[in-house]
Amino acid sequence: MQAYRSNLHSIPTDCPQREKNGWTADAHIAIDLGLLGFDGITLYEKWMNDIIDNQREAGEISGIIPSSGWGYGEWPGPVWDAVMFIIPNALYDYYGESRSIERLYPTMLRYLDYLKTKEKDGYLPFGLGDWVYWKATTNNEYTSTAYYYLDYKLMARFASLLGKDA
């Protein structure tokens, strides 16, 4: 709990000893701790607004939010970018709060349109994938495509919650 608290500086950060950046995957991996151990709703609602501000016209977002312009492109990929789906879903599950879903809905649609342009034969062949384990041999295509599926699954849920066509 103390380590998590040490990583909150108006945004969820990756670690207390090095970068202290708002890495998006680190945040969505720790969302349950943030909501169960702390009353983190306002922090995450604010950070979801940062994600909206971070999105480029083509639909991509940075792997670090806020960003000074670094971390865009195919480098971070769907595993990191899924933050815009996973955190609003967690806020809804824990608090019944749908404001983040409503605010992010157009951002999510634009992002999914962006991913469609990167798709090759139904797969997304880019992104960091399973990068933590130094001997990892999992093809990034698998992890990125799995999160692509998750994004669409959550988007269908959000469309239903908001009374929209999926």
Regions found by a protein language model. Give the residues of each.
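Active-site substrate-binding loop specific to GH73 endo-beta-N-acetylglucosaminidase modules
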Residues: 132
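Extracytoplasmic/periplasmic, Sec-exported soluble proteins
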Residues: 76, 80, 100, 137-147
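Active-site neighborhood of glycoside hydrolase catalytic domains
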Residues: 138-166
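Substrate-binding groove/exosite segments of carbohydrate-active enzymes
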Residues: 1-117, 126-129
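Glycan-recognition and catalytic cores of secretory/periplasmic carbohydrate-active enzymes
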Residues: 122
